[in-house]
């Protein structure tokens, strides 16, 4: 893991903590505003603003039936781009059975 940033941006850190909580603790059920607020120690109004912003970008989605939030498809697409950028998965660097 990377070292802690010298000048962290608190809002970004809170948004990432929220995404990590949804990823690790809620499964397909998602989480409500109160649950996220309690789990992260963040005020409900801040959680609402974070959720609204993350939903706008497609990183989370809200179930209209349950009013709970879960990870969205845009976040999945971001994750898919990681292997393409990681040298461990760079096929050009793998040894070829045809090279001498």
What are these regions (language model features)?
Residues 74-100:
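Conserved segment of winged-helix/HTH DNA-binding domains
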Residues 2-83:
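N-terminal helix-turn-helix
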């Amino acid at each position: 893991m990377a070292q802690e940033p010298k000048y962290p941006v608190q809002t970004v850190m809170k948004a990432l903590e929220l995404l990590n909580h949804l990823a690790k603790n809620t499964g397909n059920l998602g989480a409500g505003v109160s649950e996220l607020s309690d789990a992260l120690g963040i005020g409900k109004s801040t959680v609402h603003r974070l959720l609204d912003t993350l939903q706008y970008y497609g990183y989370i989605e809200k179930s209209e039936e349950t009013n709970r939030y879960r990870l969205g498809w845009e976040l999945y697409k971001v994750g898919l781009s990681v292997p393409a950028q990681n040298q461990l998965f760079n096929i050009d660097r793998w040894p070829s059975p045809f090279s001498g």
